[in-house]
């Protein structure tokens, strides 16, 4: 199977923010516009009779400044998290949520119709016989009859004829309805059985289920740089090995500046240090591994072990390898997870250097990297 390429989906850009508001003093009034640039520059423009110093002293100005500052800090945080906290978008499905009972609902049953012809009543039959007797008595060519005798002689016969005719219609109607019900219910059952089989294939982790999921990843995974995935799945062993190639170097795309809040309440923007960028690279690589692992586990509950290996472009060098098991992975809280700390609890291969104020994740020569992975797997079996 060929590699599966996941194209980048860029986070929202950091843009200037501005707001215009009205300022009033005892005798003057005007409008002011405060603009905050991505570089942390506060630009102030006043319109009307009001002075700049007066406008800046207003409570509206202070509120607006705080609002723009908080919104700009949030944009910086979101841009940073798009790289270093990719895993926070993850949510692992519980194995129990894949059950047939929860995912496949009965298709229903055919609703029988009712015959739209009323059952003959005794009064209707009697009225027919009475009318017939009266018609005979009004016929000048016929002999007159006793109405009561005629009713007595013919009522039961007419009642039976009408009921027999209605019964025949009812039987034919029921036969038609049964045929329609049998066809409809057979179709419902066919759809239900197919849905059950499809869900059971997900539960069992059929190979085509895994293949289909990986081919859908370009539409479902959200990453800010191009990656390529390859995998080897063993259904019987309930294990999958996934390799990730960083087709694009994330260190070249991660935000190069960071914003902080000063004691004055304003924000400051500065270029990241080399240590900051090294930390970002390590966080981004590990966050990506957790993110991919979660999405792989969500394919099927049959996957109990997920091994993720991360490489540079074209697999020139290895970066990191980890082996995750579903049971412990299901206990992680991704919203507060620190991958750099958590990775120590998993079997791993990485050239991670923890320095005083930062962590550095260096790549390894490919052969050395893969030999260490084999050694780790052997020691675990």
Residue positions per predicted region:
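Long, charge-dense low-complexity segments
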Residues: 1-381
């Amino acid at each position: 199977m060929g590699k599966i390429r996941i194209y980048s989906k860029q986070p929202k850009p950091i843009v200037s923010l501005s707001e215009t508001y009205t300022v009033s003093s005892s005798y003057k009034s005007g409008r002011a516009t405060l603009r905050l640039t991505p570089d942390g520059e506060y630009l102030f423009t006043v319109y009307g009779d009001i002075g700049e110093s007066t406008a800046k002293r207003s409570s509206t100005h202070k509120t607006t400044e705080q609002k723009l500052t908080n919104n700009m800090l949030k944009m910086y945080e979101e841009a940073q998290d798009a790289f270093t906290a990719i895993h926070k978008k993850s949510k692992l499905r519980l194995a129990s949520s894949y059950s047939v009972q929860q995912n496949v609902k009965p298709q229903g049953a055919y609703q029988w119709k009712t015959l739209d012809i009323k059952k003959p009543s005794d009064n209707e039959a009697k009225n027919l016989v009475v009318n017939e007797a009266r018609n005979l008595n009004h016929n000048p060519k016929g002999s007159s009859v006793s109405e009561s005798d005629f009713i007595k002689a013919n009522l039961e016969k007419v009642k039976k004829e009408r009921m027999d005719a209605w019964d025949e219609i009812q039987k034919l109607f029921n036969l038609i309805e049964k045929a329609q019900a049998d066809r409809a219910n057979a179709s419902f059952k066919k759809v239900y059985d197919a849905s059950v089989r499809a869900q059971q294939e997900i539960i069992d982790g059929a190979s085509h289920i895994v293949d289909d999921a990986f081919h859908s990843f370009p539409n479902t995974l959200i990453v800010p740089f191009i990656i390529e995935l390859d995998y080897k799945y063993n259904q019987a062993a309930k294990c999958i090995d996934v390799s990730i190639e960083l087709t694009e170097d994330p260190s070249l795309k991660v935000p190069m500046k960071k914003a902080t809040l000063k004691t004055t309440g304003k924000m400051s923007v500065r270029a990241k240090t080399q240590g900051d960028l090294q930390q970002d690279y390590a966080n981004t690589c590990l966050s990506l591994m957790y993110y991919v692992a979660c999405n792989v586990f969500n394919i099927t509950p049959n996957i109990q072990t997920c091994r993720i290996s991360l490489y540079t472009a074209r697999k020139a060098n290895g970066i990191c390898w980890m082996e995750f098991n579903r049971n412990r992975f299901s206990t992680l809280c991704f919203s507060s997870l620190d991958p750099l700390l958590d990775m120590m609890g998993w079997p791993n291969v990485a050239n991670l250097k923890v320095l005083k104020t930062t962590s550095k994740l260096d790549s390894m020569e490919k052969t050395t990297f893969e030999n260490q992975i084999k050694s780790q797997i052997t020691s675990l079996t």
